[in-house]
């Protein structure tokens, strides 16, 4: 287990560990416990470790070769900010079929890696990523299937604060791995700036 990237209470305050009342066999290894009300709770240390692993993996790519997507409303602003901070390409909102597979489509792009906010709501992007043979990094909750996911980050992928914090951490760690930020340097904007304003 790696050292925590931020204090435990900050992870807890953002609700990263709050899962759902369903679980899949794929996600079982990331579950810490089940509450008396049947809600599955994710292991924050495993989330932390997967953010580190995903950031290291993404840092092997040029920002322009990374595509981050979110159909889910609460993920759209975090994805936008992730792109602004790292230089990655983003598609917040509806993913148009053919974006990765149809060269005749006006907005056709050829990324080398996909970052998805939710394997279920971003399934079209993930299907196309698999069709063209690029790896998929995804934020995954307790009920997600990982069949088409190469690197899963176990997290509450429905929570506004949780999604924002994970994308903030990914951006920070990515820039640290690239040597753009020093090992102990933070982004010049707080995680709250990644949140969808309501």
UniProtKB/Swiss-Prot annotation:
It holds the Pfam family Ribosomal_S2. One of its GO terms (cellular component) is small ribosomal subunit. The keyword Ribosomal protein applies. Keywords: Ribonucleoprotein, Ribosomal protein. GO terms for biological process: translation. GO terms for molecular function: structural constituent of ribosome. InterPro entries: Ribosomal_uS2, Ribosomal_uS2_arc, Ribosomal_uS2_CS, Ribosomal_uS2_euk/arc, Ribosomal_uS2_flav_dom_sf. Belongs to the universal ribosomal protein uS2 family. NCBIfam families: uS2_euk_arch (TIGR01012). This is Small ribosomal subunit protein uS2. The lineage of its organism: Archaea, Methanobacteriati, Methanobacteriota, Methanomada group, Methanobacteria. The gene is rps2.
């Amino acid at each position: 287990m790696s050292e925590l990237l931020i204090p435990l209470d900050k992870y807890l305050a953002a609700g990263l560990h709050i899962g759902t009342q369903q679980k899949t066999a794929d996600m079982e290894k990331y579950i810490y416990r089940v509450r008396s009300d049947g809600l599955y709770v994710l292991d924050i240390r495993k989330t932390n470790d997967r953010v580190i692993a995903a950031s290291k993996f993404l840092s092997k790519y040029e920002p322009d070769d990374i595509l981050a997507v979110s159909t889910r409303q609460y993920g759209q602003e975090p994805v936008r900010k992730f792109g602004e901070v790292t230089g990655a390409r983003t598609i917040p909102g509806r993913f148009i079929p053919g974006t990765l597979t149809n060269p005749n489509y006006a907005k056709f792009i050829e990324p080398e890696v996909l970052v998805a906010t939710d394997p279920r709501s971003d399934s079209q992007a993930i299907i196309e990523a698999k069709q063209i043979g690029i790896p998929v990094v995804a934020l995954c909750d307790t009920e997600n299937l990982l069949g088409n996911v190469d690197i899963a980050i176990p997290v509450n992928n429905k929570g506004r604060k949780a999604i924002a914090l994970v994308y903030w951490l990914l951006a920070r760690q990515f820039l640290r791995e690239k040597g753009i930020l020093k090992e102990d340097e933070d982004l010049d904007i707080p995680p709250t700036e990644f949140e969808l304003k309501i």
